Amino acid sequence: MATIHRPRRGSLAFSPRKRAKSEVPRIRSWVADERAGMAGFAGYKAGMTHVIMIDDRPRSLTEGMEISVPVTVVEVPPMSVAALRVYEPYNGGIRPAGELWAENLSQDLERAITIPKARRGASLEDIESRVDELCEIRVLAHTNPRLLTGVPKKVPDIMEIPVTGRSVEEQLKAAEGLLGSQVAVSNIFNVGEWIDVSAVTKGKGTQGPVKRWGIMLQKRKHSRTGKLRHVGNLGPWHPARISWRVPQLGQTGYHQRTEFNKRIMAIGTNGTDITPDGGFVGYGVVRNEYMLIKGSVPGPVKRLVRMRRAIRPGAAFAPKAPQILYVSKESKQGV
């Protein structure tokens, strides 16, 4: 029998394929930007539609022509900055060196966490006096889902977002201005900018190896045994155990995933400009600020989506605002 050469089915890079610990995605890498302000933002996925725009990709076959582009609508009400947290170098890494909480906190914040009474490093003067010892400034920000009509919850999602700037002093000054305020997405991102999106994907429960790993179905005589959708071989006799590399059934979906280099097509404040007739299926009407992101975004509707500036932007063309001629508002009911 001839030797068969083929790549293995499914990627081991995402193992173990288990449920995400939290629906708030964890982002470990951020762009060192010179612009003073928050390095990321968060919103809630409302649905998808399409736009007609002028193709502005250089050397494209349709450059300068009208093209149809699918977009994802993300509702992004203002985020509230509840605290700032400073970090200092420690053993080759960093560790928290103090934090300062705002005075006018949202009442909904107590639904998510217990606000600390003994606040370490709660004096702004103390933090400013040790600015030479600090290496990074971050803020604790949370969403305001009470403002949303499509997300039926009141408990805010809390996350830590770095503050960018040319120096630690500039970062601290920017964080002081953000403390206790509400930040709009238009203060963070620009139209046409490249961003990365992170979210938890749709959960599909326990699935077999064919759907979970993409293995081939059993062929011809092998399927006559009554087992069609299973892996043909679990491994050798010895070692007398099944390797973790063997594709088997298990949890599928509800994993944290990050997609790189998504283009911001539009940022607006009037949700009626993009809400389809009858509202988005399973979501409703967009009533706050919104973003149109080119392509798809992981997760179902109502899922939290975190965004950051692109950490490895492509060199296709410089970011610029696209020329959008039409946004589809046709009903999505029954589609």
Swiss-Prot record:
Q: Supply one GO BP term.
A: translation
Q: Which HAMAP family match?
A: Ribosomal_uL3_A
List the molecular function annotations (GO) for this entry.
rRNA binding; structural constituent of ribosome
Which family does the UniProt entry place this protein in? Belongs to the universal ribosomal protein uL3 family.
Keywords, alphabetical: Ribonucleoprotein, Ribosomal protein, RNA-binding, rRNA-binding
Q: Explain the purpose of this protein.
A: One of the primary rRNA binding proteins, it binds directly near the 3'-end of the 23S rRNA, where it nucleates assembly of the 50S subunit.
Encoding gene (name): rpl3
Q: How does it assemble?
A: Part of the 50S ribosomal subunit. Forms a cluster with proteins L14 and L24e.
Pfam families associated with the record: Ribosomal_L3
Q: What is this protein called?
A: Large ribosomal subunit protein uL3
- Listed InterPro entries: L3_arc_euk, Ribosomal_L3_dom_3_arc_sf, Ribosomal_uL3, Ribosomal_uL3_arc, Ribosomal_uL3_CS, Transl_B-barrel_sf
Membrane-crossing ranges are: none
Q: Which GO terms describe its cellular component?
A: cytosolic large ribosomal subunit
- According to the record, the residues making up region (Disordered) are 1-20
